[in-house]
Amino acid sequence: MKRIHLVAAAVSVAISWSAFAAEGKHEHGHGHKPLHGGVVVDVKDVDYELVAAPTLIRLHLRDHGKAVDVSRTTAKLTLLAGNDRQDVDLKPSGGWLEAAGTFKVAPGTRVVAVVTTAGKPAATVRFVLK
């Protein structure tokens, strides 16, 4: 009988946690809205905003709502559009990471970014373009 109560309690906690997570509420006091017209993904309290155009890609980083110094940061993107795959290296440019060229960035394109900052472990960020 105790096992049934334990399982029921565990299921109840799991359902409560998923409902809380689905609401989009965050304890850290900032939202994840795009500031530059891109797609935002949060990984370990850092917001990564990918702004992708056919000739320019930018990646903006914010930590708890404040811009991150990207002077020692690089990123390697993999763009996946249907059967097409394209690798893109982003370098610091002003307060963001950037690459110029010709890119396939249609809605639905999946992007995997590996972001590396000196002295820190790399972060893997996944986007789906809108």
Name what the model sees in each region:
Residues 2-5, 16-130:
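Intrinsically disordered, low-complexity terminal tails/loops enriched in metal-binding residues
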Residues 9-15:
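Hydrophobic helical h-region of N-terminal Sec-dependent signal peptides
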